C-alpha cells in the first residue's frame, strides 16, 4: 500500500466525511416531491385534470414538512403537520372545483412522506437476524405512518 494511514488520520478522515454530508438543495427536494406526488396520483388512476393541483399541494406539503422539521426538530410532529395541511388543501381544492378526486390527491401528496426505505430496511434487518435494529427501525417507520394516518383521519373527521 503506497500511503498507509494511522488510526488518528483515519479517524479524522472519517469525521470529515461525516461532517460533509451533501444533501440535495431544498428547492430540488420540493420539486422532486411535487413530481412524485403527481406521478403517484396518476399511477393510482387519477385524472390528468388533478395533476396540477396535486403537484402544487405535494410540493407545498413537503416544503411544510422540511421547514417545520427545522423549526420544531420533532420528525413526527412535522409529518403530522404537513399531512394535516395536505388533507385540508386537498379537500378545499375539490370543494373549489380545482380538483375532482380528493382521495387520490391526498394519496399522491402524502406519498413522499411515507417511510418506504425505513420499512424495507427494518424488514431486511429482521431477516438478517439484527432484531434490535430491525424492531427499532420498524417502530420508527410505523410511528411515521401512524402520524400521517392520524392527520388525514382527523381532517376527514373534521370535514365530514
Each model region followed by its residue ranges:
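Short helix-adjacent coil turns
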Residues: 4-5, 46, 129-130
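Core alpha-helical transmembrane segments of integral membrane proteins
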Residues: 23-94, 99-100
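C-terminal ends of transmembrane helices
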Residues: 16-17, 42, 61-72, 118-131
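Catalytic cores of large soluble enzymes that bind and process phosphate-bearing ligands
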Residues: 2, 6, 52, 56, ...
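Generic detector of multi-pass transmembrane helix bundles and their immediately adjacent loops
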Residues: 95-160
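Loop-to-transmembrane-helix entry motif
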Residues: 17, 21, 75, 142-145
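Short helix-terminus and kink motifs of transmembrane alpha helices
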Residues: 8, 50, 117-121
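Cytosolic regulatory and coupling regions of membrane transport/channel systems
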Residues: 1-26
